[in-house]
Curated annotation (Swiss-Prot):
GO cellular component terms, A-Z: cytoplasm; cytosol; nucleus
Protein name: Paladin
Keywords: Cytoplasm, Lipoprotein, Myristate
PANTHER family associated with the record: TYROSINE SPECIFIC PROTEIN PHOSPHATASE AND DUAL SPECIFICITY PROTEIN PHOSPHATASE
InterPro entries: Prot-tyrosine_phosphatase-like (IPR029021), PTP (IPR050561)
Length: 868
């Protein structure tokens, strides 16, 4: 009994479909086209039975001489059909929802180069660099482009398609013309931000098979759209007899290798907005390393021509051309910077704060920025990437707070556009820094590994939006931001207000280390009297405020600024020095007292209107008490909430403690944040470790056997933690000492149920069962931040041990860059996660330093100040 597959393809009526499959009616949107069971009519007179299974229906014919197995691979009876409008034809949709739209139209070719060069917007970078850019060509057009480059004497060519969206080439007359799948909601927009792990090449192959199958079901034609402006005569049909009538990008661009041995092709998907990911920079460098002409500075052998293409030949192509021009600039190895191709069209603009910080931080930073500026100018015939930042910023500044488009804040839209353009510019500068170091070494390190050796760049990009530094009191007087009293969200769980006048006041047993919530001026007096009384006798006190948000005392109550729609969330101010925050508080205080307006304030349980008769900054609160407590020293060391202090925060805390102990070895240390909880506990642990290194580390007790669920994780034995422990000299001891310090500090705060180590697994578990995606993502971020904070404490303890011989002359931040980074610590932090508890996604942004540090820097708040 032989088995053959039926090739008949017809549309099945609903009744026929139901009679075969025994199912009810189907949705109208779904096509009923499958391999036709009406072909059974050929054998109906003899058929004895129909046997169906999950694979396909099988027809057993008369006396079992023949068997037909009808495969339903094409459709499985659920291909989706749709139409763009009621007036247009209904047809099959690729991927169940997309229409195939002609990729390039005539208006797109601004430079009018399609006829002469073969591709729209074909151009060369200025300054004599063999760097070319273009929009999407057809198959025939691409052949013309290669011929043009050959005629101009370019013997070698490396071509990069930088499109992240799928592109298919359909046979139209004698050429293959590019089409892209697009959604009905926005026919002008290509697909982007594809599912992580999905290769665009694989998606193109899938869509090709779909189009071929659809054509088989539609008499050998498929429907496409050439004119999405007027929809004249749309949709058009293209004839598809076989898969050879459809080319994928790989076929169009890779096949010339057989005719041109010195030609190379690579797919390098770049994002439409923002900077490429580190992995994309890595791929670019990896491709370039294959070309010896780029690595060797051989005057007799010119480097290959670099050709880049996206859809329009503008945004992504411009970015790629700039990357290519930087490569060729370093290949020349000549002048410190390329000569500008033409005089500047406008006066120099003020640099953004993040770029100025880069210049101040990096040796030859000024030169690196100027080189990038010159390269951008070389590639600016179609689009000036640097100018685009200022244009977006100008639009941002001209938009009112309440202006909305389609329910979304237009101001937020232009803020994101500005920040994405600025990020792209910043990463070009970082890439040039990388080339300065790595080009002479033959790219010994990939870009992603090199970035892990320069964590300061990640710290910089995390505070790209420094608009909070420019806010004024108008925000409060107009009600855009409101003042919220600290007590509203900082409960006194340790019940110390009655005795100490401040919430959550506590001491580390047998150590002069204290923690507390934010005190008012009056409460501060009570605490200072307690610390200097006859029992405690602290003659010198170092008080450190850890708050990174604006804090003001008005009418003897402590307030912070918050968004009316998010009263429970503090707004961090991204400062590089504590003085910036104190200056901002002074400005806001002056604005409030000057206004003499009734202000909307939120107290513990109610909302009131108040006019401030008095207003003090945190600095002024402490200055008031220096006359009565002459041994008091006050420091503002802002550290981020929920996460590890930054490297420089450890520097400042250690330096403050060293200075205090140099003057008096019995100094008392007091730390406060808003509630006296997270940041305060972190600083208290840092202080405990520091004092132990000054006075001697106590002996560790026998390790207790913990018989509770998740005991291993409660003890902090996560895979990623143990990876760091294995890197560190005597790493297990480093971790145990930190655990001992954490347990020592947590003994003082049992009612808070807050333990810096144990909270990691608790938060992770909460995140797995969050009520919605937003909550799950936030808890996911928190669990990773708590994990990172724990690792940083272990690293800091290791630093205290290893640098003790030199009295910690080298700051922790420098040690992290010069020692820990080289050992691979930041590479571990760049892949943070819980592999023992879940299947990790390598590309999850929060696992990466770039995504995680940006998320903790207050990103997501409405922009209230000016980008500077």
């Amino acid at each position: 009994m032989g088995t053959t597959a039926s090739t008949a393809q017809q549309t099945v009526s609903a009744s026929a479909f139901e009679s075969v499959h025994g199912i009810g009616t189907m949705e109208d949107q779904r096509s009923l086209s499958i391999h036709s069971f009406q072909t059974l009519g050929l054998h109906n007179s003899k058929a004895k039975s129909i046997i169906t299974n999950k694979v396909a229906p099988v027809v057993i014919t008369y006396n079992c001489r023949e068997e037909f197995q009808i495969h339903d691979d094409l459709l499985k009876a659920n291909y989706t059909v749709g139409r763009i409008s009621d007036a247009t034809l209904e047809h099959y949709l690729v991927q169940g929802k997309y229409f195939m739209v002609r990729d390039v139209y005539s208006k797109l070719d601004v430079l009018n180069t399609t006829a002469s060069c073969g591709a729209p917007n074909f151009r060369q970078a200025k300054g004599g660099y063999a760097v070319f850019g273009m929009g999407q060509p057809s198959l025939g057009g691409f052949k013309l482009v290669l011929q043009k480059l050959q005629r101009e004497g370019h013997k070698e060519c490396v071509f990069f398609c930088v499109r992240e969206e799928p592109v298919l080439f359909l046979r139209v007359e004698s050429d293959f013309v590019p089409y892209t799948p697009r959604g009905k909601e926005n026919l002008h927009e290509n697909l982007h931000s594809l599912r992580r792990g999905l290769r665009v090449e694989d998606l193109e192959l899938t869509i090709r098979k779909e189009i071929h199958d659809f054509a088989q079901l539609s008499e050998g034609v498929y429907y496409v759209y050439n004119d999405i402006e007027r929809f004249r005569d749309e949709p058009h049909t293209v004839r598809v007899q076989g898969e050879e009538d459809i080319h994928v990008t790989e076929e169009v661009y890779r096949r010339p290798i057989f005719l041109l041995p010195t030609y190379r092709y690579h797919r390098l998907p770049l994002p439409v907005d923002g900077a490429p990911l580190e992995e994309q920079f890595d791929a670019f460098i990896c491709f370039l390393r294959e070309s010896s002409g780029l690595l060797l500075r051989d005057p007799s052998r010119p480097p290959p021509a670099l050709l880049f293409s996206c859809q329009t030949g503008v945004g992504r192509t411009n970015l790629a051309m700039a990357l290519g021009t930087l490569i060729l600039h370093h290949h020349r190895g000549a002048a410190p910077k390329p000569d500008p191709p033409h005089p500047a069209k406008m006066p120099p603009r003020a640099r953004f704060r993040v770029i100025q910080s880069f210049i101040e931080m990096v040796p030859k930073g000024q030169q690196m920025v100027e080189e990038v500026d010159s390269v951008i100018a070389s590639c600016s015939e179609m689009h000036d990437m640097k100018e685009a930042i200022y244009e977006s910023k100008k639009k941002l500044e001209g938009i009112g707070e309440d202006y909305q488009i389609q329910g979304n804040s237009t101001k937020e839209y232009f803020l994101q556009r500005t920040l994405q353009s600025l990020e792209r510019y910043f990463y070009l500068i970082a890439f040039n820094y990388y080339l300065h170091e790595q080009y002479p070494l033959g790219f010994a390190l990939s870009f992603s590994r090199w970035m892990c050796r320069h964590p300061e760049l990640y710290r910089l990009q995390a505070i790209m939006n420094s608009s909070e530094l420019t806010i004024t009191g108008d925000l409060i007087t107009k009600g855009t931001r409101v003042l919220v009293v600290d007590e509203r969200f900082c409960p006194d769980v340790l019940s110390t207000v009655k005795e100490m006048s401040v919430a959550n006041f506590r001491r580390v047993p047998k150590m002069p280390i204290y923690g507390t919530a934010q005190p008012s001026s009056k409460a501060l007096g009570s605490v200072l009297r307690y610390l200097t009384d006859a029992k405690r006798k602290h003659s010198r006190i170092l008080w450190v405020s850890l708050r990174e948000e604006v804090v003001l005392e008005g009418n003897e109550q402590i307030y912070t600024l918050r968004e009316p729609g998010s009263l429970d969330q503090l707004i961090p101010v991204p400062v590089s020095t504590p003085e910036q925050l104190e200056k901002l508080e002074s400005t806001l205080k002056g604005d409030l007292l000057k206004s003499q307006k009734w202000l909307e304030v939120y107290l513990e349980a109610e909302k009131q209107m108040k006019m401030f008769k008095s207003c003090l900054t945190t600095q002024e609160i402490f200055n008031q008490h220096k006359s009565t407590c002459q041994g008091l020293t006050y420091r503002r060391i802002p550290i981020p909430d929920f996460c590890a202090p930054k490297e420089q925060d450890f520097d400042r805390l250690l330096e403050a403690m060293k200075s205090a102990l140099a003057e008096d070895s019995q100094t008392a240390f007091v730390f406060n944040c808003a509630s006296g909880r997270g940041r305060t506990t972190t600083a208290m642990v840092i202080a405990v470790l520091t004092l132990w290194h000054f006075n001697g580390i106590p002996e560790m007790s026998e390790e207790e056997i913990v018989s509770v669920p998740d005991a291993k994780y409660t003890k902090g034995e996560f895979e990623v933690v143990m990876k760091v422990v294995q890197l560190l000299p005597d790493g297990h001891r480093m971790k145990k000492e930190v655990d001992m310090a954490l347990d020592t500090v947590s003994e003082t705060m049992t009612p808070m149920h807050y333990h810096l180590r144990e909270i990691i697994i608790c938060t992770y578990r909460q995140g797995r069962s969050g009520k919605d995606e937003q909550e799950r993502r936030l808890l996911r971020l928190r669990s990773l931040q708590y994990l990172e904070r724990y690792i940083y404490l272990i690293l800091f303890n290791s630093y205290l041990h290893l640098e003790k011989k030199d009295s910690w002359q080298r700051p922790f931040s420098l040690w992290m860059r010069e020692v820990a980074a080289v050992a691979g610590v930041y590479e571990v932090l760049d892949g943070l996660g819980f592999p023992e508890l879940e299947q990790l996604e390598d590309e999850e942004p929060l696992r990466k330093l770039r995504g995680r540090w940006r998320a903790q820097s207050g990103a997501g708040w409405p922009s209230r100040g000016d980008l500077v």
